[in-house]
Amino acid sequence: AKMSLSSYILILTLVLFSQGILLSASKSIRNLEDDMVFNTFRLGKAFQKEDTAEKSVVAPSLEQYKNDENS
């Protein structure tokens, strides 16, 4: 009887321990995801800025091309 009780306690300890690990892991994963989302957002903003800069360079030549095509 003593043996099964100690193994039960051992299993219970392992389960609680692994749940604790999972909990802390999921927390750090969530933090990682937040960082990734934040970085992606910042990258996206940077790309948008570059994009508008490129558009202001490209757009005039496109307009010229359209006008040439119509005439």
UniProtKB/Swiss-Prot annotation:
Locations listed in the record: Secreted
GO biological process: chemical synaptic transmission
GO CC, alphabetical: extracellular region; synapse
Keyword check for Thylakoid: no
Keyword check for Signal: yes
InterPro entries per the UniProt record, alphabetical: Prepro-melanin_conc_hormone
Gene Ontology MF terms: melanin-concentrating hormone activity; type 1 melanin-concentrating hormone receptor binding
Keywords recorded for this protein, A-Z: Secreted, Signal
Signal peptide positions (record): 1-20
Family: Belongs to the melanin-concentrating hormone family.
Record-given protein name: Pro-MCH
Annotated source species: Carlito syrichta
Gene this chain is encoded by: PMCH
